[in-house]
Regions:
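Residues at the N-termini of beta-strands
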Residues: 49, 110-113, 144, 169
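Structural motif corresponding to the early beta-alpha repeats
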Residues: 77-90, 103, 113-120
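Short, acidic/polar
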Residues: 30-43, 88-107, 128, 155-156, ...
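Active-site mouth loops of central-metabolism enzymes
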Residues: 22-33, 82-90, 122
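CE4/NodB-like, metal-dependent polysaccharide N-deacetylase domain
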Residues: 92-116, 135-139, 161, 192
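Acidic (Asp/Glu)-rich catalytic clusters
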Residues: 14-15, 63-73, 100-109, 159-163, ...
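N-terminal binding-site loop/beta-alpha segment at the start of enzyme catalytic domains
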Residues: 1-76, 132, 201, 282
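Beta/alpha (TIM)-barrel catalytic core signal, keyed to glycine-rich beta->alpha loops juxtaposed to Asp/Glu
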Residues: 84, 118-283
């Protein structure tokens, strides 16, 4: 399975005709000035999946890059996230539609995937945001809907009000030091695709001796090993960089495979919630 992966590999989504690219490109903290350039570099390198959010304040720049790339819109998978609920469903829906306009300003523009950015903050907020996302999906402005930073209990709680359930994606922090095994196991048992943000641990582990030894063994960078690890765990990694050479290198992960011993060694680095650099979900 793993050896046959390519940059064009995709995963099916529940009850959806869409295919989610196995590798995504993250743009968190990519400023307006650099975001367009970075996205164009990523698209030229073969990425076909860009992950942004309202909170990142660069949706418009992502949309601009998609237009400038010359690649058909249908060939690029765009994800965004709604950060907080407004006072009611209609106001929250308008925030989502505003994001869609920024990302795809055609009359029939759409976003492929829209997530609740932090499903662990407010149960009432989740209810409002999900209803707004369901409306946007019903109208074709959003193709699929999901969650981020959700544990089992947050997703289970949605059953009480959701017309669309389960969410097609759960995007959580994932890397060898924070494997969130319970959330991953639950999500995958429900057919929910698991996406990995911070797969490179923001370069904080670049000097880790265990990681370095595996990178040296394969003549790869530590970042390439971490991206490949995610792919072989059946997670969808979303590596982020604004350095062109690193953007390209992070996509060059399909010519090698981590063996069973490599995977076991990396699995053994897990520190549970203490290994998180952003957030470990509460299950």
């Amino acid at each position: 399975m793993a050896a046959k992966l390519s940059i064009a590999s995709t995963l099916p989504l529940l009850d959806s005709p869409a295919q989610l690219p196995r590798l995504g490109f993250g743009v968190y903290k990519s400023t307006a000035e650099t975001c367009v350039r970075s996205c164009l570099t990523a698209l030229k390198a073969g990425y076909r999946h860009i992950d942004t959010a309202q909170f990142y304040a660069n949706e418009e720049q992502v949309g601009q890059a998609v237009k400038e790339s010359g690649i058909p819109r249908s060939e690029i998978y765009i994800t965004s996230k709604v950060m907080t609920a407004s006072s009611d469903v209609p106001a929250t829906y308008e925030k989502i539609v505003d994001s869609v306009r920024k990302l795809d300003d055609r009359p029939d523009g759409y976003v492929d995937l829209f997530l609740i950015h932090n499903a662990s903050i407010s149960a009432e907020g989740n209810k409002i945001m999900w209803a707004a996302l369901e409306q946007a999906k019903a109208e074709g402005k959003v193709k699929d809907i999901g969650v981020s930073n959700a544990g089992k209990r947050h997703i289970e709680a949605m059953k009480d009000y959701a017309k669309v359930w389960p969410p097609v994606v759960n995007q959580i922090e994932l890397h060898p030091w924070n494997q969130q095994r319970e959330a991953v196991k639950y999500s995958q048992s429900q057919g929910i695709v698991v996406e990995a943000y911070c797969p490179l641990v923001r370069n904080l582990k670049a000097d880790d001796k265990t990681l370095l030894s595996i990178a040296e063994k394969h003549n790869k960078t530590t970042a390439q090993v971490l991206v490949r690890y995610c792919l072989q765990k059946d997670w969808v990694p979303l590596p982020k960089s604004d350095t062109p050479s690193r953007i390209e290198a992070n996509a060059d992960v399909f010519g090698f495979e981590l063996d069973a011993k490599d995977m076991e060694t990396l699995d053994n680095l897990d520190q549970g919630p203490w290994g998180a650099i952003v957030q470990a979900v509460d299950n």
